[in-house]
Amino acid sequence: MISLDKDENEIEHHNEENSLVEQETAPVGQESRQLSASAVKSLSDIAKWGKISGILLIIMGSLVTLSVLMTVIGAIPGVLLIISGVFLMRSAKAAAEAEGNLTGSAGESMLENYGTFIKMQLFYAASSIVTVLIGIIVAIFVLVVIGIAAFENTPSYDDPDSYYYEDDPVFE
């Protein structure tokens, strides 16, 4: 099951990967700067609407996955929507924890999860395009097969029963 919270080992491992440049600028970044009122409102909107959008993405992904579960290719966009919803909810949760300043792990977590959400949306869009193209190709193939089958069943002048209609009109 995908958790909305990262475990502590993952957070510690990520913090250890900071480059020297990030470590040198850390004291400057640790200063507590208050954000403007519009930035605080934006964080509030991200927290509120991000959570709602994340829940809707998870629900929509579940429905897409269940509706096309017959094929693995069809289920891939649904799974990607679920993953996108989880990362959007994580980003919204981090935005709610930021409380007016983006310093510390809340701001980093929000931006990291939002970046992952954007990547998942790219993969979702690409897989949806591929799925639609495959669907169009299959639909064209089915229509061609139906057309060939209908053409084969159409009576022609070579049919032995056609002599009834050649000389005498059916309705007089």
Swiss-Prot record:
GO terms for cellular component: membrane. This is Uncharacterized protein YwnG. Residues 1-17 have a biased composition (Basic and acidic residues). It holds the Pfam family DUF5362. It is found in: Membrane. It is a single-pass membrane protein. The chain crosses the membrane at residues 129-151. It comes from the Bacteria. The gene is ywnG. Residues 1-27 are annotated as: Disordered. The keyword Protein biosynthesis does not apply.
